[in-house]
């Protein structure tokens, strides 16, 4: 994983390029790229910003504004990653949060240094 990978992923999401970020994540972790769609599946609470559906490998988002939310995109990608690797989707909320926060913290650290994160694109 290149040094600026995590900050780059967050930057892409903030820049409205969530699909490109998901492609890079999938390539890096050697898994398929999940589909991304706006609109939660029936039965999901409107208070959830996103959810991952293993059947169909789809990340569903509450609305289009969430497309630029790195925490939600990365959190749901973690569920895709776990489901792809070990077929488990239970008890992973804390780890999904941790995964997302790790990327966001790396982005913040690069931003504090004044680095041009987007140069990796």
Put a short name on every predicted segment:
Residues 2-59, 64-66, 113-121:
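Auxiliary, metal-adjacent structural segments of Zn-dependent hydrolase domains
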Residues 9, 81-85:
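Short amphipathic alpha-helical interaction patches enriched in hydrophobic/aromatic residues
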Residues 28, 77-80, 108:
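Metal-dependent phosphohydrolase cores
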Residues 52, 78-80, 99:
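Aromatic side chains
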Residues 57-73, 86-91:
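Short pre-active-site segment immediately N-terminal to the catalytic Zn-binding motif
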Residues 73-82, 95:
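Active-site His/Glu-centered metal-binding helix of metallohydrolases
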Residues 89-121:
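Post-HExxH zinc-binding segment in Zn-dependent metallohydrolases
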